[in-house]
Amino acid sequence: MSGGKSAQGPEEGGVCITEALITKRNLTFPEDGELSEKMFHTLDELQTVRLDREGITTIRNLEGLQNLHSLYLQGNKIQQIENLACIPSLRFLSLAGNQIRQVENLLDLPCLQFLDLSENLIETLKLDEFPQSLLILNLSGNSCTNQDGYRELVTEALPLLLDLDGQPVVERWISDEEDEASSDEEFPELSGPFCSERGFLKELEQELSRHREHRQQTALTEHLLRMEMQPTLTDLPLLPGVPMAGDSSPSATPAQGEETVPEAVSSPQASSPTKKPCSLIPRGHQSSFWGRKGARAATAPKASVAEAPSTTKTTAKRSKK
């Protein structure tokens, strides 16, 4: 593997993979004088390399990763699948979100089981370029998925395929008993043991699920931010005479108070004699009034305040007698 510190490709002037970049993203060392020797041996032992979102344009300089099982190259600017034959042990390859236009140079990866080529620029499928060992394949976001009979063609060409574009190939899923009886080869990058088929698939499905949840959470956050930018209800113009929401002060409806109060309360002269007692008797004393006067007092005009002077004169005459 080239030991140059620069990530610039000598031919195209693009960004390529270097020892320095791999070390920066995937290794940590104590500061001592034997760093170079330790780095050489540790690179050879790496099983997982993450180089996503580094602006990489070219795949190269992977010869020193002899034990590599998983390679993450998503979110770069890679245009061509190349220079992977030097890592035949590779089982997990993510090239999502690049600028790849065709599937090629994958037949030298006989152990490859997971391949993510989603969100690229692939228009035409060359099914004979896919390794027969594939269990999970993701081509979503490419125009090649729109061709007639796409799913049937892919599943027919890949007899071991169990999941295509996030949808299981139902007829090929094996039972849970067979899963439990499978071997326990270990892949630390996926946090648990898995076999070359079903167990590996389970761990990869969990990895995909975490990516989906992250995308959903990002979409929800963007939606909430857009909602916060919408005008509130109180910012909208109100109809005439309608109070603002949340305003319970009396001054909020002055027009209604001025128009309706004179109509609801009538003067004693304008109302009929039978309605005077109801308008003048307070609610707190109404029950005692009915107890003293009985039913006749409800309609008798003598109960009005206007009759009070005559009652005073009668009392004065009795006192003189």
Curated annotation (Swiss-Prot):
GO biological process: maintenance of cell number; single fertilization; sperm axoneme assembly; sperm flagellum assembly; sperm mitochondrial sheath assembly; spermatogenesis
UniProt feature coiled coil, ranges: 201-221
Stretch list, region Disordered: 235-321
Keywords: Cell projection, Cilium, Coiled coil, Differentiation, Flagellum, Leucine-rich repeat, Phosphoprotein, Repeat, Spermatogenesis
Main location, first listed in the record: other
LRR repeat positions: 45-66, 67-88, 89-110, 111-132
Phosphoserine modified-residue sites: 175, 182
Organism superkingdom: Eukaryota
Residue stretches making up the LRRCT domain: 142-184
GO terms under cellular component: sperm midpiece
Keyword Phosphoprotein on entry: yes
Record function comment: Required for normal spermatogenesis and male fertility. Plays an important role in sperm flagellum biogenesis.
Name of the protein this chain belongs to: Leucine-rich repeat-containing protein 46
Gene: LRRC46
